[in-house]
């Protein structure tokens, strides 16, 4: 898994690539990267899943932990470009009832305002 951060106005966009699974853990997890942005004062986080091929229960936990951390500070965390396969996983885990998920980045960005 590789994660690159970019900014658009006051929104932090994390472009995630590869597989989000426990066996691919690097030194820094997605949740840690989100927490770093929150600690620096950012409150609008967008996770771009366009290049994500697979997610396991660890990855689902990372997303949920990121959502909770953001929500607890009054921020918003949203997801964009989820594949049908990943969307099914989010449906089964009931995350579609908690998370805002968008098909297009521009729509997701506008939803923050």
Put a short name on every predicted segment.
Residues 1-15:
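Short beta-strand/loop segment at the start of cytosolic alpha/beta domains
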Residues 20-98:
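Amphipathic alpha-helical interaction surfaces in cytosolic regulatory modules
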Residues 100-104:
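Short acidic-hydrophobic, aromatic-tinged amphipathic segments that line or gate anion-handling sites
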Residues 12, 107-110:
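A short acidic, often aromatic-flanked loop/helix-cap motif at beta-alpha or helix-coil junctions
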Residues 2-4, 109-113:
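Short hydrophobic/aromatic patches at helix-to-coil boundaries
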Residues 84, 106-107:
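Acidic phosphotransfer microenvironment of two-component signaling modules
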């Amino acid at each position: 898994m590789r994660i690159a951060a970019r900014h658009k106005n006051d929104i932090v966009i994390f472009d995630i690539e590869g597989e989000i699974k426990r066996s691919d853990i690097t030194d820094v997890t997605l949740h840690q990267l989100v927490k770093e942005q929150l600690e620096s004062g950012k409150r609008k986080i967008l996770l771009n899943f366009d290049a994500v091929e697979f997610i396991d229960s660890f990855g689902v936990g990372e997303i949920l932990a990121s959502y909770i951390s953001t929500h607890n500070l009054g921020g918003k965390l949203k997801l964009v470009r989820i594949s049908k396969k990943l969307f099914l996983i989010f449906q089964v885990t009931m995350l579609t009832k908690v998370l805002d998920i968008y098909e297009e980045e521009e729509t997701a960005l506008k939803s923050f305002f």
